[in-house]
Amino acid sequence: MIIYILFSLLAAVIVHLVYKKQTGFKLKGKHIVVVGGSSGIGKELVYELLKENIASISVISRSLDKLRSVVDDCPSEVCTKSTPLNVGSLKSKIEIYSCDITNKIKVKETIAQIVSKNQGGKIDCLINCAGFAIPGYFIEQDEEIFEKTMQLDYFGSLYATKEVVPLMIENGGQGGHIVFVSSTCGLVGVPGYSTYCPSKFALRGLAETLRSELKPYKITFSVVYPPDTDTPGYQQENLTKPEETVAISGGGKAVSPLEVAKSIVSGIKNGDYHIAYDVPTKLCAVLSPGLTPFYFSFFDILLAPICRLVGIIAMNQNDAEVLKSWKKRNQLKK
């Protein structure tokens, strides 16, 4: 045990000295595209980004009414602020585009519109924030729900990224930054989310692959793992969420989308690859790193065995909740 601890400490020190974190992304003066920015986390993210003296922000969503509300609902303390880059209302920096992101042709056309409208055609940062979930029991859900979830949560982000990456490569050697909003369900499998977890795991896999593949082009990445967040989508989820899923998720407690949005902006500026809001999710990120940058630098090595132990305990607790709910349902059938 002592040898293991000493070895871990030595490895941690070496990693701390050798490992180089990706450079933080400067938002000031940048053109940002937010996919899925008409409600929830995405909408709050638009307002938080406006505080960073960005040049402009293009918001993509399917509902035109919701897109208009992004402009109309902009908080006065944000959208009436004067900045060196834009004296007057910051509302003028918001551009809205109605698009069904599950349609790759429409996505291609929308990105082309955004490029043509912005001088120079630059897109400096892409934030993929669209997604939804329909919780339920695997044996009771139709295959169409799995397909629909994957189409929006994964392919919607893929289509936008596929169009934006070539623009970033041609961005005069400046590269860019791409954010994928995954979920805590993209780090661990949660009973009741068999339609949702695979789509969020897929985003992690895409980001992990592109982080290395596009490194020569100075394109950096962040993956966000929000916990349950009090959004319109979350309220809809609760209509079909199994009892054990509620218990495993913390009894139905949800965090503010504003707080999650703030953590995303902070993570982008800090150069964080993994962006998590709460401690449990951060520990899950340490437990499931893949071939990605460290979360806590050398502390990742020290925390790994502890996180694994906590993970086993959590797994057993989840299994107990599932069994408890299963027995309860069977009793009601009698």
Swiss-Prot record:
Binding of NADP(+), residues: Y196, K200
Molecular function as annotated in GO: 3-dehydrosphinganine reductase activity; NADPH binding
Pathway: Lipid metabolism; sphingolipid metabolism
Annotated localization: Endoplasmic reticulum
Enzyme Commission no: 1.1.1.102
Signal peptide stretch: 1-20
Assigned keywords, A-Z: Endoplasmic reticulum, Lipid metabolism, NADP, Nucleotide-binding, Oxidoreductase, Signal, Sphingolipid metabolism
Domain of life where this protein originates: Eukaryota
Major localisation: endoplasmic reticulum
InterPro entries listed in its UniProt record: KDSR-like, NAD(P)-bd_dom_sf, SDR_fam
Binding site for NADPH: G36, S38, S39, G40, R62, K66, D100, I101
Entry similarity comment: Belongs to the short-chain dehydrogenases/reductases (SDR) family.
Function text: Catalyzes the reduction of 3'-oxosphinganine (3-ketodihydrosphingosine/KDS) to sphinganine (dihydrosphingosine/DHS), the second step of de novo sphingolipid biosynthesis.
Name this polypeptide is given: 3-ketodihydrosphingosine reductase
Lineage, uppermost ranks: Eukaryota, Amoebozoa, Evosea, Eumycetozoa, Dictyostelia
